[in-house]
């Protein structure tokens, strides 16, 4: 059977999967090297590692979003999101749109909030840790307490779809994005970085860490963000302060990012790549 194998992550990319009882089997059979399988990776680093480790060629098809459909807007439902967080009109809503796992570098987000010298230093995190335990979350809370930052999980307010439970609104992640003033995404490692595409889609000011795949496959295309290089420095903090008070400059930059994303990470790009892939069978 002709098969397309689409690889988002490989076991060798995660330290937590390195201790196992079937390493020989994994190293020799996963993924399978067969003539009827065409392999797809989501970044150029994974492509190179797959070739080096298994001798398997692949094509890169990056993650995409429907950039030809305009993003949602603030409406009668989501206009209450900030107040449901307990925010006042002049408070900053700083969103970390990730799970609570160590490779997300959330300690850098906490430090950013601390160094912005806000009257109410708060960081809101959209998702729980899931299967990676609570030790990192406990450590983050201690770090935040030392730095005087109020870190809040808001997963109880966010669901796959909008709705109401016991007369309380449940919002979509898009509702959270639309209400934010600053998105933090200081990841140390990502297979691609969906939150980057999402932040581009909603045209919001974003600070990110230059993780390897970003450096290899996203930054060279011309996108512009506030960048960290593994740590928070005063230059980045000053840039955040300046842009938070420069909505026209943010609008210009985010519009340019949106146009670049339409060119490189749209559904039309995916369709063209899939047509090329299927034509090889």
Q: What does each model-identified segment do?
A:
Residues 11, 20-40, 48, 52-53:
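Membrane-proximal helix-turn-helix segments that form the acceptor-binding/catalytic region
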Residues 45, 64:
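Carbohydrate-associated surface elements
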Residues 82, 88-104, 110-113, 123-125:
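Conserved donor-binding/catalytic core segment of Leloir-type glycosyltransferases
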Residues 134-175:
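Nucleotide-activated donor-binding/catalytic signature segment of Leloir-type glycosyltransferases, i.e.
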Residues 188:
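Aromatic "clamp/platform" in nucleotide-sugar-dependent glycosyltransferases that forms part
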Residues 205-209, 225:
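Short hydrophobic beta-strand element within catalytic cores of glycosyltransferases
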